[in-house]
C-alpha cells in the first residue's frame, strides 16, 4: 500500500512538472523557470502588461510591450509598434502598473482541470478582507471570454478579473501551474510566489507576510 501511494504521489508531481514545462515560455536563456516553482531573482521587477477587463467590452490580446528598452528579454516597442502597456488609454483595460501603488497579489488561472475556478472564490474572499490595503488581480489565461464573464457574475466575484486571451502575460511571467500566485511589493517587485490550491487562512497568512515584508522594506 505504501509503495502504491508513493507511485501515485510521484505521478502527480511528474504531471505538475510536465504541465509547467508545456505552459512555460523561456526567454533568451536568462532567468528561465516557472513562477512559483523555480527560484526567481530577489526583488524581480514584474514586467508591465495591460489586459482587457474580463467583464468589459474591450477586445484584443494582452499588451506586454515594455517601457524599458534596455532589456532584450521582454518585448520592447519601437516607433512603429504599439504603445507600452502602461501608457495605453485605461478605459476598459487593467494596467498592472496602476496596481503598484500598494502591495499586490496576482492569481493566474486557467480552467483546464483541477479546482482553479473554486480557488478564485477563495481569492475573492481574501480580496474583500484586504480591499483598500492590498491590490488583487485575478488573471484568466486563454479561456472563453463569455465563459469567464459568466463565471464572474454567477460567483459574485468583486475582485478585478483580467483576460489574457492569447497567453502573452502567462508566457511573460513564466506561469506553468494553475493556480500560480505572485506577491509583489509596492512599486512592482516580487516578494514571493507560490503554486497550488490554498485555503483562505493560508492565503491570508501569505498576504500578512507580504504586508510585514513591505513594512520592513519601507523602514530600511
Predicted regions and their residues:
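Hydrophobic beta-strand anchors of alpha/beta hydrolase catalytic cores
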Residues: 105-106, 136, 181
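Ser/Thr/Pro/Gly-rich low-complexity linker/stalk segments immediately outside membranes or between
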Residues: 26-41
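A short beta-strand-turn-helix
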Residues: 50-104
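Thiol-based oxidoreductase modules, predominantly thioredoxin-like and allied folds used
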Residues: 132-147, 157-167
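Hydrophobic membrane-insertion alpha-helices, especially the h-region
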Residues: 8-24
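Conserved redox-active cysteine motifs that mediate thiol-disulfide chemistry
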Residues: 108-125
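Thiol/disulfide oxidoreductase modules built on the thioredoxin-like
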Residues: 101, 150-158, 165-219
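Short pre-active-site segment immediately N-terminal to redox-active cysteine/selenocysteine motifs
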Residues: 102-104, 109-113, 177
Amino acid at each position: 500500500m505504501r509503495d502504491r501511494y508513493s507511485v501515485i504521489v510521484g505521478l502527480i508531481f511528474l504531471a505538475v512538472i510536465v504541465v509547467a514545462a508545456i505552459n512555460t515560455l523561456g526567454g533568451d536563456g536568462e532567468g528561465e523557470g516557472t513562477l512559483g516553482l523555480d527560484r526567481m531573482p530577489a526583488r524581480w521587477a514584474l514586467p508591465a502588461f495591460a489586459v482587457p477587463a474580463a467583464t468589459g467590452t474591450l477586445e484584443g490580446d494582452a499588451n506586454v510591450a515594455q517601457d524599458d528598452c534596455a532589456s532584450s528579454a521582454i518585448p520592447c516597442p519601437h516607433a512603429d509598434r504599439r504603445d507600452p502597456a502602461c501608457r495605453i488609454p485605461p478605459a476598459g483595460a487593467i494596467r498592472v502598473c496602476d496596481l503598484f501603488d500598494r502591495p499586490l497579489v496576482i492569481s493566474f488561472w486557467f480552467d483546464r482541470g483541477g479546482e482553479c475556478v473554486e480557488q478564485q472564490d477563495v481569492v475573492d474572499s481574501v480580496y474583500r478582507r484586504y480591499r483598500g490595503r492590498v491590490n488583487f488581480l485575478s488573471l484568466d489565461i486563454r479561456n472563453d471570454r463569455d465563459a469567464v464573464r459568466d463565471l464572474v457574475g454567477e460567483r459574485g466575484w468583486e475582485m478585478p478579473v483580467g483576460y489574457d486571451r492569447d497567453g502573452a502575460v502567462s508566457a511573460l511571467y513564466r506561469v506553468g501551474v494553475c493556480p500560480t500566485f505572485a506577491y509583489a511589493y509596492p512599486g512592482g517587485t516580487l516578494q514571493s510566489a507560490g503554486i497550488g490550491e490554498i485555503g483562505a487562512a493560508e492565503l491570508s497568512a501569505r498576504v500578512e507576510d507580504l504586508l510585514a515584508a513591505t513594512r520592513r522594506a519601507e523602514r530600511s
